[in-house]
Amino acid sequence: MASYNRTRRIAEEIRKVVSTMLINGVKDPRITSMVSVTDVEVTNDLRYAYVYVSILGGDEESTLTGLKSAGGYIRREVGKNIKLRYIPEIVFKLDDSIEKGMYMDSLIKRVNEKNAQQNEDENYDE
């Protein structure tokens, strides 16, 4: 249990550092300001940190390529800010949960509109 709490705390610290780096420290033009870190998962051995990013607007593939090329720099900054024996290898992954959530929201709105229209039609027929 203590190991889980430690990895969770480390993941949260990595998320903070990477988020700050994306706002202030990375100068790659492929990385837009519309990139946000949604989650970080760290393996139990602390060798890998999977950083899930959400990219709103813009070219997702180009942005991911920019993030991967800046990975070494970001890893070095993580090492400066978090004191660990091993600095995890940063692996960026696209998190499309926001897009999926927006799609589900649009489906729910469409169903609600259909139900409202059917209720109006039924009330009109009476």
From Swiss-Prot:
Any one of the GO BP annotations: maturation of SSU-rRNA
Top-level taxonomic group: Bacteria
Subcellular location: Cytoplasm
Family matches, as InterPro entries: KH_dom-like_a/b, RbfA, RbfA_dom_sf, Ribosome-bd_factorA_CS
GO cellular component terms, semicolon-separated: cytosol
SUPFAM superfamilies named in the record: Ribosome-binding factor A, RbfA
Gene Ontology MF: a single term: ribosomal small subunit binding
Coiled coil start-end: none
Signal peptide location: none
Keywords: Cytoplasm, Ribosome biogenesis
Entry annotated with the keyword Cytoplasm: yes
Subunit structure comment from the entry: Monomer. Binds 30S ribosomal subunits, but not 50S ribosomal subunits or 70S ribosomes.
Record's function text: One of several proteins that assist in the late maturation steps of the functional core of the 30S ribosomal subunit. Associates with free 30S ribosomal subunits (but not with 30S subunits that are part of 70S ribosomes or polysomes). Required for efficient processing of 16S rRNA. May interact with the 5'-terminal helix region of 16S rRNA.
Family note: Belongs to the RbfA family.
Protein name: Ribosome-binding factor A
Species annotation: Clostridioides difficile (strain 630)
